[in-house]
């Protein structure tokens, strides 16, 4: 078994929605990113790659590569799962914490879990997503952006 940790941050910018866990959520701002800015899936991808000792998403999908401009992070996550599987690993479970003052995540968590489970090829009970605020402290509390921490457990295939 192997454990990996992922962390990602994106700042708010222009737009009227964000994409988290594959779910489009209306919001007064968008997230600034080279891809679709899905900070949740980026952190999960990093956790999976880290557990398999395969670097991070920047190594596999550099933001300097125009092929990944506006990329669908669900497709990137599925590619990460394939890379990890090629090295002999399968997902045991994943757990993520979204750190954001706004928008409210609770109405979207179950949909996120379902999409992530689908992309990972695992059962719903192998995926956990939760959200918290920082009580208006720091950059997330000032609503300047969103951060996500994620952990992944990999098991030998």
UniProtKB/Swiss-Prot annotation:
One of its GO terms (molecular function) is 2-C-methyl-D-erythritol 2,4-cyclodiphosphate synthase activity. Homotrimer. Involved in the biosynthesis of isopentenyl diphosphate (IPP) and dimethylallyl diphosphate (DMAPP), two major building blocks of isoprenoid compounds. Catalyzes the conversion of 4-diphosphocytidyl-2-C-methyl-D-erythritol 2-phosphate (CDP-ME2P) to 2-C-methyl-D-erythritol 2,4-cyclodiphosphate (ME-CPP) with a corresponding release of cytidine 5-monophosphate (CMP). Its cofactor is a divalent metal cation. InterPro entries: MECDP_synthase, MECDP_synthase_CS, MECDP_synthase_sf. GO terms for biological process: isopentenyl diphosphate biosynthetic process, methylerythritol 4-phosphate pathway; terpenoid biosynthetic process. Keywords: Isoprene biosynthesis, Lyase, Metal-binding. Pfam families: YgbB. Disulfide bonds: none annotated. It comes from Pseudomonas paraeruginosa (strain DSM 24068 / PA7) (Pseudomonas aeruginosa (strain PA7)). Belongs to the IspF family. It comes from the Bacteria. 4-CDP-2-C-methyl-D-erythritol 2-phosphate binds at residues 8-10, 34-35, 56-58, 61-65, 100-106, 132-135, 139, 142. This is 2-C-methyl-D-erythritol 2,4-cyclodiphosphate synthase. The lineage of its organism: Bacteria, Pseudomonadati, Pseudomonadota, Gammaproteobacteria, Pseudomonadales. Binds 1 divalent metal cation per subunit. Its EC number is 4.6.1.12. Pathway: Isoprenoid biosynthesis; isopentenyl diphosphate biosynthesis via DXP pathway; isopentenyl diphosphate from 1-deoxy-D-xylulose 5-phosphate: step 4/6. CDD domains: MECDP_synthase (cd00554). A divalent metal cation binds at residues 8, 10, 42. It catalyses: 4-CDP-2-C-methyl-D-erythritol 2-phosphate = 2-C-methyl-D-erythritol 2,4-cyclic diphosphate + CMP. The record marks 34, 133 as: Transition state stabilizer. It is an enzyme of class 4 (lyase).
